[in-house]
Amino acid sequence: VSAPIRDLPELHSTKAARLLAAAGELLIGRGAKGFTVADVATRAHVGKGTVYLYWPTKEDLLIGLIGRAFLHLLDDLIDRLSAEPDLARPSRFCPAMLQIATSQPLVAALQRRDDDLLGVLTDHPRSIALDGALGPAAVLGAVLPIWRRNGLARDDWDVDDQNFALRSLITGVAFSMFGPHGGAGVDDPMAVLAATITAILGPERANQKQLRHTAAEIIAFLRDAQLTALGLISSPINE
């Protein structure tokens, strides 16, 4: 677990951990509109007042759940890149990021704007800020220049246009696999995604030193992103 995540209260309090687990189960099972703070307390076997010791409002608790989903997404990417710098290749990084993101139900729900699940959280300023700073589009926007500098993406194409093409590809693949009519229609959609990324970005010409440098740069960005997430979880922004 990365250093920023170690500061979360649930890692030091079993009550906080139970409350988060209970709130997560209720959110996934009933949607944001389908339960109260009292329901969370009952499921966690604590008094209602205990919830407010950690989260002043239900809104803060739910934003905390979404923020933690992003934190764990980033932490998973950091762990994988640290163990295997070759994962920094675009053809490997993008499928890995998509798989990790879609394995986090709240991140996936935010990407598809699932109002039934998220309710007011769908358009909440802090949800929007979390996705804008830490979502797949934000991560791609940060790592594309790193790839271009290190021989992993062609640099003869306007970076904004290149980023748009890449985001459109990944969004389309995600929708085809996990949208309302899910089912990609191919045996290995991630292999197709990897090949298409290479077709868009060009051959990955980086040597091992460049790959290690790329992985280190991406990890540094992801660690900064975790700090951003923690700030958004703990400090409401002007709404």
Annotated model-derived regions:
Residues 2, 138, 142-150, 175, ...:
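C-terminal peripheral helix-coil segments that are non-catalytic and often amphipathic
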Residues 12-23, 40, 65-73, 77, ...:
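Generic hydrophobic, amphipathic alpha-helix propensity
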Residues 18, 60, 92-96, 161-168, ...:
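Amphipathic alpha-helical interaction segments
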Residues 18, 26, 30-60, 64:
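Helix-turn-helix
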Residues 22-26, 100, 169:
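Short amphipathic alpha-helical elements of helix-turn-helix/winged-helix folds
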Residues 64, 78-109, 113, 163:
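Hydrophobic alpha-helical connector segments
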Residues 101-126, 141, 210:
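Amphipathic alpha-helical segments used for helix-helix packing
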Residues 119-152, 157-175, 191, 195:
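Amphipathic alpha-helical packing segments from all-alpha helical-bundle domains
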